[in-house]
Amino acid sequence: MKNLNFFLAFIFISFISCDNEPVPDSFSFGLENDFKINGEYHSVDNSLKFKITEINDSRCPSDVVCIWAGKTDVKIEVESPVTGTIVLSTYDNSVDIVGNFSFKIIDVLPYPISTKTIQLEDYNVTLKIVELTN
């Protein structure tokens, strides 16, 4: 009987701890979060849903000397609560607003190397998303 009570308590605690694990495609406002292309993401409270639909990387490879450093453009489609499309750039448009949400591009990795082709699915886009108050 003692073993049965221990087993039941263990099962109960396991179920409770599973509820506290973060959902893989969710993010928290005000923090730097990493995102992939074509992933569908939503805020922890489900007040915002979006996906990254394009990444255009024209940065100068780290092992090459260039006149211009280049830039990366990231296209984001916001699906709810309002719909809209924004393009954030590592060069001249690092912040944009859709509805009452501010999107800021922090980084795009990996950084290009002249001898390696980066596949779109290998990119990691770091964004900071803030819910604006009225």
Locate each region found by the language model:
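Sec-dependent N-terminal signal peptides
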Residues: 5-14
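Short Fe-S-cluster ligation motifs
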Residues: 90-112
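C-terminal partner/receptor-binding element of secreted or periplasmic proteins
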Residues: 110-134
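Cysteine-centric segments in proteins
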Residues: 44, 50-53, 58, 64-65, ...
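Bacterial Sec-dependent N-terminal signal peptides
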Residues: 13-34
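Short acidic-hydrophobic surface loop/beta-edge motif
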Residues: 37-45, 94-99
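Short polybasic amphipathic segments
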Residues: 39, 72-78, 125-130
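Mature extracytoplasmic domains of secretory-pathway proteins
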Residues: 48-94
